[in-house]
């Protein structure tokens, strides 16, 4: 104790006689009770877009978009560069060893000297049509055309023989890509097959991963062969790739195999075309040499086509020729080389392919590659479709279809679904910018065939406006279509998508719906029914009234409730509800639907969680406030379901999102002047969302708002009834706040609730809240360790300072006295585990000095209306003033004790903090204390300590010290001038 008293002396340089005091002497530091404060009075107060309209824009390079992939762009460039940089050493045709042509330049291997580009000036000299300009295809297609690259990922994802393993292809930039390690024995086998002279070698049946490995190898070897100027080997690789497309043993994988294999064929075709074109464009020689180059280009193309024509097997011959189809540009003028003639010839040759599935995919490949050559030419596509229909009819009459389904153990629906990608591409190319006559010709083809698969892709490919304007006709088409090639429910689903995207005639909207639903409502399979309903709910929401929407929901419930059929179609129901939320933003209007809430009650498990969240999102985005009991009950029901779906293992981000969602919903509930109902609602919310701190935080603030609203309603004069209500509100806060785990939320709520209780004259409850807040200060962690270590010292200082400001007007307890809360706070501050070298305790003790100064005044600087503070209760009491002075002196001693402990700390940061505390204490003493000899001596010593301890680099603190000295010089008292003169002499 003796050590403590010694340590609390002003400074080591204080005069000895000032430290030796007798118990009878009065305190040396006196409060000034005559400060002129300005008195203040505080008054209380998604249709998913149609699949053929989700368009990726064509690149603005002006060139037709090629199928070569970005991951191999550098490889292709290097291969082309190697091809164009080689030197001419032979006159032998690399594609025909028996060729005795006497030309000096090999059209395939011999590089051409750089010449002026003859194609850019006089392309007509090559005969026939002009070469397609680079921006021709770009100008032809628009946002309504879906590029092939957009279709590829969905094909690779959907068509696989092994659903558990996604297709991975290293050289593809679409879909799922990833490098695949190819076993060395597999690689050797493929390379050996390429070296065989016989072109009739057949590939052995392998698994899906094996086939992908084969294609990986073929692609890699193609690039290597081309870069090494091995043109014959490159052609053999293309042939080998095409042969793989004759195998349909893994029939479910065939569409994906087609996508991968044609990527390799595209690469081959582009390499051939780009090499010839680059050699022509790089030429800058004389006119005579320009003519020679044209002839060489023609000869090169002819040699490629002659060699391809010598392939005995029809399928690889067609695939490889189609891959270099664009090269016909260079030999226009020759016999039978006009593009349309070539395309027609190939389309007729496809009829020789025996497998209808393979034949249809080669039709799609022809359509795709010819689209680069002459996109406006569509007549041959109609003929291809006629061939498809004819083939289907032929095989339906024979045993082929039955045998195929039996061999591959596949259903008819699944088998016909394999044709979808090829048909979709055919019809898209045909329907894009097609004339009405072309569309009518396609429809006539359906009328003759009644093929439902064809009809499905007609509907999906034709413009939605065309479908809507002829909706009755298409509805009849669906009824007339056969049931073998494609399911009826999928036809109606595709039809519904177009009706949503377009605008049917107003006088036909209901008749179309009724006509369709007469058929759909009789579907026996609930999944077929709900698949159509999932699409047509958006049609009803878009084009029909709310009454029709409710009737439509009633029909859905009638189908799915018996035998608990809804349990197997949760995802479809969820999609229906989400579409309803998207189209009807007024949640109050939704709950007025007779059949909407019963639909929400059908969800369970994870679907219930998702739909509960969607329901709350719909409510939270409502633009109007509500007090509808049905809507509130809906909120509490689905809010509780969402609350109960989360636990301690849930991600904190998810908990925060749900909490904010619930808070947003609470903000939408307002009972106006009926504050009792508002409080009852908050009571229900607290019971429902007991685990959400953020919600409880909002509820406490909401109850405080109720108190303020009540105070305004009674104009500051509470009646016995409102007084009881206020007490109930404060009790709600007192009960709710301790249940919040977040200490920072908790502390703020205690402070706010205490203020509200004081404003509403609930003094005993305010006292209890303040006492609880003081107790919980000890639980504030000095350091937070979340993601990074962070000190809470600044927050704690700010909070306690606000708390002290409230204590200024808080009346003392009639039994415990005016100081019991202040002294309790003083004890908590003193015992709190502050960080080492912290001056926070001294800062707060200086705040308490200011509190003591306020209490020493005859009138406090501010008041709360209708609340008698300590200036009215205790100012005239001598015991109050004596105890106040003693407490004031004890605070100064504690501050000096801390300064003595910290002044010898070596680091500059602590030195700066100590210097600031010295200056703060000087200013506090000058402003609130009575300037006597004891105070003057303390100020003198504090100033010298600050001057000595503040580092020379701390310019702001040094300026603060100088300003403090200047302020002392403005004091009018003799004691103040003496201090100033004494300190000035030391400068």
From Swiss-Prot:
Chief place of localization: other
Record has Protein transport as a keyword: yes
Biased composition, class Basic and acidic residues, residue ranges: 43-63
Alphabetical UniProt keywords: Endosome, Protein transport, Transport
Coiled coil: none
Assembly, per entry: Component of the heterotrimeric retriever complex.
Membership in a protein family: Belongs to the VPS35L family.
Record-given protein name: VPS35 endosomal protein sorting factor-like
Role played: Acts as a component of the retriever complex. The retriever complex is a heterotrimeric complex related to retromer cargo-selective complex (CSC) and essential for retromer-independent retrieval and recycling of numerous cargos.
InterPro entries listed in its UniProt record: VPS35L
Biased composition (Low complexity): 1-23, 66-111
GO CC annotations, alphabetized: endosome
Compartments, as annotated in UniProt: Endosome
Region annotated Disordered, chain positions: 1-115
Biological process annotations from GO: endocytic recycling; protein transport
